[in-house]
């Protein structure tokens, strides 16, 4: 009989572990946070100039420093951003992008429009 009692406790613990495992299983798919960089321009013409620079092979951080109206000194690095901490269109785009590097960036094309202006977004990490 004692094994059943242990099994009962184990089952309860197992359910809790199962819930934690479910949360962990969901994390790699969409993640709850992204390490993001962006280039923000108020004017569409300026963001398209920045896009052309990126397409010609200029590093994302350099283009951000030259063109972005936000966080330019950090090369557009916003750090880790969690779900719910970003405006809707920015968040949707950030979580849809694959993780990429400065050497081979994958960014939003066309730029994403928010109340702040036009963003070119790239994601460097996901957790």
From Swiss-Prot:
Record's keyword terms, sorted: Cytoplasm, Cytoskeleton, DNA-binding, Isomerase, Nucleus, Rotamase
Function, in words: May be involved as a ribosomal RNA processing factor in ribosome biogenesis. Binds to DNA.
Name recorded for this polypeptide: Peptidyl-prolyl cis-trans isomerase NIMA-interacting 4
EC code: 5.2.1.8
Main location as per UniProt: nucleus
Lineage: Eukaryota, Metazoa, Chordata, Craniata, Vertebrata
Domain PpiC: start-end pairs: 31-125
GO BP annotation list: rRNA processing
Localization: Nucleus, Nucleolus; Cytoplasm, Cytoskeleton, Spindle; Cytoplasm
Catalytically driven reaction(s): [protein]-peptidylproline (omega=180) = [protein]-peptidylproline (omega=0)
GO molecular-function terms, A-Z: DNA binding; peptidyl-prolyl cis-trans isomerase activity
């Amino acid at each position: 009989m004692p094994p059943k009692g242990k099994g009962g406790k184990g089952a309860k613990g197992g359910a809790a572990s199962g819930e934690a495992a479910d949360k962990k299983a969901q994390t790699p798919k969409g993640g709850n946070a992204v390490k993001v960089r962006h280039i923000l321009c108020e004017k569409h013409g300026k963001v398209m100039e920045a896009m052309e620079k990126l397409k010609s092979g200029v590093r994302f951080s350099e283009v951000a420093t030259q063109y972005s109206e936000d966080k330019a000194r950090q090369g557009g690095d916003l750090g880790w951003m969690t779900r719910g901490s970003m405006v809707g269109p920015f968040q949707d785009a950030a979580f849809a992008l694959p993780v990429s590097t400065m050497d081979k960036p994958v960014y939003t094309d066309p730029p994403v429009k928010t109340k702040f202006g036009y963003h070119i977004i790239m994601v460097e990490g996901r957790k």
